[in-house]
């Protein structure tokens, strides 16, 4: 293929492809995602037959025929270069080229010796035989039919992947998407996208509407066509759910649409929406709800979210009506206080007595208000005085960390809600058809419950089961959509017992947490330290200062970095979790002799890294917010001995979550993130010996009381706040963040 350089008349860089091979790798970035190399082109008429190529080189083997996709560019210092977007291996024609191609292909158990044997047997037909005639390959000594079949699959997939890469680049789409498309849609990936490119943004993880839209418009799809509007509406509602909302008003949808549709007016959107309404109404996953007393404008929602909110309200109200009467025992307080050694406050007594009377109850209160004391007293009364079998009492929490804390403070076995429901790859073992057998179920940290897990939980509750929810209504809402605890409390249909007395008044952390709730500036104590920087302080300097706190904390209090959690309001920015994670890791877990292990999206991992799961994975049994440590990083291994029957290992990462080790492929690590620093939202339900938090104007939208309160109450012994002039004051004046758009409270009140 002829290589061409750009002419001065060209107003924008044009995608080009050139054929050649790499002669020398000049530079590779630390994470292995960017390279500089010397190339030799096969086209003698190229503007430079030995150009420097820079960018994402997907293949780094030297002297292997490659096709480079990218753009010519003139660097002010280094001159003419080729900026690479993707590389695709080209099939060689000579025996030596085929041998080198096979030996560097990455195909399991196909190294240099085996490649020579194959080429000696099949010559220039070797690649075709590997792809189409595995039975001929299996006739060679030392190659089993099973291995030949695996090789056939490997090389057929390589062809498919390279075809997808080339096709995507026509539309200026990131070629890294090719592997995901092939994995999710198989050989039909290109046909699927051609039939409706908008499926990319609603069915493929990590692909936004802009990417799918760019491809669709390049393929000639109409700018205001029904397919575009339906896909946009679906995408916007899915994005709203990721931000916690269960519905959107027409005005919100229109504003969001205008941000994504270039060169389109509000009138255009309304006209296109009118034409698309039949298709929107016919879709099974989107729903328009007419105006009512709750949302006078009407609302758009995903059918699943609307169904869960309505269904959850019906189940809770039905449970209240159908539960058998509670035993009419009166609590013998002298006996219980003697048994537990606790003198209960009036509010605590009222809570225990109320919980015993009702089929469902809620206890809410901040740190130090006696929630744990009530739980211990309730469990003691049930087991010792009412002879309730301990096996019929289940304690659960949304995360493994919260469940472990619950077990430690109550002395009763606790588990995650997912384990309680016996999660499987395709659902839950306990559900509406097979309810949980327990008589009592107590769930702690219920502010973390999102709509989907609350829905799954209540579907598995039998009429005779008594349910107690415990949580702090002042904490941030769940990571997932909904505001379940707040909605249940606000509905007024469930008995709620609020605890307001602080029994830990000597704790500087607890005292200051309550000051934050009332909008009062915290005071410095032995347990709560903070430093205020001038407004506009250089964030790199702040980050450097934050890093010095890790050894200082160990020197002053004896807590190692494993016991310190850095919390930040947001992910991006100089003081966001992404930047902080890299900086903290390089300090506490620096790169060793082994190279970093590279996973999806160029993410890198090292043995010993603290990581968190960022999506629920029911098949693996790990869930959003779970924290683990990388225990083993397996790099690609090659086995080329004919007599060695071991199978080489694919790249994999082993992560220990508590007592469980979970294995991830490179592609699956898109579900993992470093967790040396994490968002305040992700830290819900956890408790750490030491918490360090930067709170700066960069995170203006997240400078509010719930964020500061939630972060502060995650600390058990020490909390350290780094802030900027005015930022804390703004947080204290902002009583709450953006209120989530949910309807569970309204449905509960009318169910």
Residue ranges and their predicted role:
Residues 355, 366, 398:
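P-loop (Walker A) phosphate-binding loop of NTP-binding proteins
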């Amino acid at each position: 293929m002829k290589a061409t350089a750009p002419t001065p008349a060209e107003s924008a860089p044009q995608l080009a492809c050139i054929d050649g091979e790499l002669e020398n790798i000049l530079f590779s970035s630390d994470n292995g995602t960017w390279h500089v190399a010397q190339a030799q082109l096969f086209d003698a008429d190229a503007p430079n037959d030995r150009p420097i190529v820079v960018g994402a080189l997907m293949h780094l083997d030297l002297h292997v025929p490659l096709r480079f996709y990218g753009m010519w560019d003139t660097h002010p210092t280094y001159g003419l270069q080729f900026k690479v977007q993707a590389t695709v291996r080209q099939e060689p024609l000579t025996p030596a080229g085929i041998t080198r191609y096979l030996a560097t292909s990455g195909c399991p158990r196909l190294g240099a010796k085996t490649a020579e044997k194959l080429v000696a047997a099949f010559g220039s037909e070797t690649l075709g035989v590997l792809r189409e005639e595995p039975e001929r390959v299996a006739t060679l000594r030392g190659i089993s039919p099973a291995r030949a079949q695996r090789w056939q699959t490997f090389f057929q997939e390589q062809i498919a992947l390279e075809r997808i890469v080339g096709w995507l680049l026509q539309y200026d789409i990131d070629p890294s998407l090719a592997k995901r498309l092939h994995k999710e849609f198989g050989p039909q990936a290109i046909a699927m996208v051609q039939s409706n490119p908008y499926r990319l943004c609603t069915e493929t993880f990590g692909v936004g509407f802009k990417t799918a839209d760019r491809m669709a418009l390049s393929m000639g799809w109409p700018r205001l066509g029904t397919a575009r509007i339906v896909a946009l509406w679906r995408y916007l509602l899915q994005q709203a759910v990721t931000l916690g909302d269960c519905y959107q008003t027409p005005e919100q949808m229109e504003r969001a649409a205008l941000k994504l549709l270039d060169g389109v007016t509000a009138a255009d959107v309304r006209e296109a929406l009118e034409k698309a309404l039949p298709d929107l109404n016919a879709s099974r996953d989107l729903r328009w709800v007419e105006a009512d007393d709750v949302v006078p404008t009407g609302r758009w929602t995903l059918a699943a979210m609307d169904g869960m909110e309505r269904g959850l309200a019906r189940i809770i109200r039905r449970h209240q009506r159908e539960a058998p009467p509670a035993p009419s025992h009166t609590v013998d307080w002298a006996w219980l206080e003697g048994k537990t050694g606790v003198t209960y406050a009036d509010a605590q007594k009222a809570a225990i007595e109320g919980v015993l009377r009702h089929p469902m109850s809620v206890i809410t209160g901040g740190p130090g208000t006696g929630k744990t004391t009530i739980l211990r007293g309730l469990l003691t009364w049930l087991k010792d005085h009412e002879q309730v079998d301990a096996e019929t009492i289940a304690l659960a929490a949304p995360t493994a960390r919260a469940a472990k804390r619950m077990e430690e403070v109550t002395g009763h076995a606790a588990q995650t809600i997912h384990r309680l429901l016996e999660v499987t790859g395709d659902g839950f073992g306990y559900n509406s058809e097979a309810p949980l057998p327990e008589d009592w179920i107590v769930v702690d940290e219920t502010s973390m419950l999102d709509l989907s897990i609350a829905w799954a939980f209540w579907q598995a509750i039998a009429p005779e089961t008594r349910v107690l929810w415990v949580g702090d209504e002042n904490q941030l809402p769940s990571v997932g959509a909904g505001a379940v605890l707040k909605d249940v409390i606000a509905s007024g249909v469930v008995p709620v017992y609020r605890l307001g007395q602080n029994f830990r008044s000597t704790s500087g952390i607890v005292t200051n947490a309550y000051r934050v709730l009332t909008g009062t500036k915290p005071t410095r104590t032995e347990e709560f330290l903070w430093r205020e920087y001038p407004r506009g302080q250089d964030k790199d300097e702040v980050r450097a200062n934050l890093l010095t706190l890790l050894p200082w904390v160990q020197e002053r209090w004896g807590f190692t970095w494993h016991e310190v959690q850095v919390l930040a309001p947001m992910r991006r920015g100089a003081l966001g979790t992404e930047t902080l994670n890299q900086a903290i890791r390089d300090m506490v877990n620096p790169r060793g002799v082994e190279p970093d292990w590279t996973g999806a999206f160029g993410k890198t991992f090292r043995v010993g890294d603290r990581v968190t799961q960022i999506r629920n994975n029911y098949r693996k049994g790990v869930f959003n917010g779970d924290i683990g440590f990388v225990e083993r990083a397996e790099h690609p291994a090659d086995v080329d001995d004919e007599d060695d029957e071991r199978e080489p290992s694919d790249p994999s990462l082993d992560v220990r979550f508590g007592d469980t080790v979970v294995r991830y492929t490179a592609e699956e690590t898109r579900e993992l993130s470093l967790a040396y620093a994490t968002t305040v939202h992700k830290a819900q339900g956890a408790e750490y010996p030491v918490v360090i938090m930067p709170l700066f104007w960069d995170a203006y939208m997240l400078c509010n009381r719930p964020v500061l309160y939630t972060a502060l109450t995650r600390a058990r012994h020490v909390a350290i706040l780094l802030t900027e002039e005015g930022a804390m004051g703004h947080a204290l004046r902002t009583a709450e963040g953006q209120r989530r758009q949910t309807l569970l409270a309204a449905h509960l009140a009318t169910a």
